Regions:
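Hydrophobic alpha-helical segments, chiefly the membrane-spanning helices
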Residues: 288-294
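Hydrophobic transmembrane alpha-helices and their helix-loop junctions in integral membrane proteins
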Residues: 1-232, 241-243, 249
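Hard-cation-handling environments
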Residues: 226-278
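Conserved small/polar residues in nucleotide/adenosyl-binding loops
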Residues: 276-283, 294
Length: 294
């Protein structure tokens, strides 16, 4: 709970975002804070022997996903909003672990690493552009000055909210559907509500930063529309955008239908025939997307 910043031990993670943005992207979004998720998944045979602990994990994850999404809504520091978003997404993974959906937890861990790292790096690009200003109430109108960062942030945001075809759609919706299917009504409803909070705080950042009015001093506003940040800052955005959008599409089969984790995780009900029928509608969408790309 502490390592993956779950309620009530989540307070350390937003404060750790005071460091450099690349550190936030690499460690706090993709690796370090997910160690707790990996540990529970790796020890899944042991946790399967303790039903009470699994139910506790399920409710902790659901509460974290919803509660921290609400906290993100009232933040104005761009990095803190993304930090609370990270905790909320870790709640999805924790809830999946509590429902014995270990493959789905690892699925979301993988997809989340890419689009959340992209969001952090886009935030860093924005902060540099705005002379280290992080308050989104003072930042605005960057769409015409930072077109590459704008597009990268948009794709990462779509994946975060679970827009169809993006990586986040496959991993998040799979977790929510599976938890609802197996009868966990209260966690299911909390995760559904967290979708709305995720959409709200993501839209808050996106439209305020790229379409709002800037209140920065005139000497800090850059009126040159061609002045994007250096190539060294833009290259990682290109690298992370593709997996943020398409990764879920290509690893859906080995994780959801295949047996990638059969020797390491105690995956049980995920591959039942009844659950396969439940997922038929999403599998059909998955096949349509594959055909469109091919």
């Amino acid at each position: 709970m502490a390592k993956s910043a779950q309620v009530p031990l989540q307070f350390w993670l937003p404060d750790s975002m005071e460091g450099p943005t690349p550190i936030s992207a690499l460690i706090h979004a993709a690796t370090m804070v997910t160690a707790g998720i990996y540990m529970v998944a790796r020890l899944s045979p042991l946790y399967e022997l303790t039903d009470g602990v699994l139910i506790f994990i399920l409710y902790v994850g659901s509460i974290t996903a919803f509660f921290l999404g609400l906290v993100a809504l009232v933040q104005n520091d761009i990095k803190r909003i993304i930090a609370y978003s990270t905790i909320s997404q870790l709640g999805y993974m924790t809830a999946a672990l509590g429902a014995s959906l270990y493959s789905l937890a690892m699925f979301h861990l993988i997809t989340h690493a890419f689009f959340k790292a992209l969001l952090f790096l886009c935030a860093g690009s924005i902060i540099i552009k705005c002379h280290h200003e992080q308050d989104i109430r003072k930042i605005g109108g960057l769409r015409k000055y930072m077109p590459i960062t704008y597009l990268a942030f948009m794709y990462a945001s779509l994946s975060l909210i679970g827009f169809p075809i993006t990586s986040g759609f496959y991993s998040k919706e799979s977790i929510i559907d599976a938890i609802g299917y197996f009868g966990h009504t209260i966690p299911y409803l909390m995760l559904l509500l967290s979708i709305f909070t995720t959409t709200l705080y993501t839209s808050k950042i996106f439209f305020k930063v790229f379409f709002g009015e800037s209140t920065l001093p005139k000497e800090e506003q850059n009126d040159n529309p061609k002045n994007e940040n250096d190539r060294q800052m833009l290259l990682p955005l290109f690298v992370l955008t593709a997996p943020s959008v398409f990764l879920g599409l290509f690893i859906y089969d080995p994780l959801m239908i295949g047996i990638l984790f059969q020797n390491s995780l105690a995956a049980n009900e995920l591959m039942t025939v009844s659950y396969t029928h439940l997922r038929a509608h999403e599998t059909s969408l998955h096949l349509v997307c594959r055909l469109l790309l091919e």
